[in-house]
Amino acid sequence: STISLGKENWAEGASTVAIGFKNHAAGGGSTALGQENVSWGTTNFTAGYQNVAGDTSQGVGSGGSATAMGKYNVASADASMALNRATTATNQAATSMGLGTTADNVGMLAVGVNNASGAGDTSANYYYVDGAYTGSNPGVAFVVGNGDINSSNGRAGDNPSNAFVVNYDGSATLAGDLTVNSDMRLKSNIVTLGSTLSKLLLIDGKSYTMKSNEAI
């Protein structure tokens, strides 16, 4: 059975639901709520305005379990999620949140504004499978975007950038400074060391080379 309520909605496939205005739910168990949303594939879900869940380049019923909510969001991969405004999730189990962000690695989380996409491994492969490393790029696990916004349409601008990137191999890149706070409330027996300049002058600095031949 299908349910279509409102105006110019289209519910196609078993147990599909389209409610609102010009929504399209196609594929078993898919739901589209709001205005001009498309849930294309099995068990996909959209809510809001002009969101797309599923890969519309494929046949009805292919892919599934994608979610897009908010405005202008696209979740095109299996079990992906795109939230808020004009975000895109293009790889399996990836999630994009914020404004104009893109999550294009497996299981990746993109937040913030207009991150730089295309880094890591944008294929559907993951570097660690069945307890063994496959040799593929570890890929990006988490990114915070700090790119610009296009004032004419409120979407991502032409200058994407990243404030912080964490890769699956544990490496990370921070674009700015890292400030580590020292909270006095968490400490006891605080004793003043007195003059420490003479002690600092005793520090014997060293340079060395890592085994990977990267000079430090």
Task: Briefly describe each language-model feature range.
Residues 1-174:
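Periodic small-residue-enriched repeat registers in elongated scaffold domains
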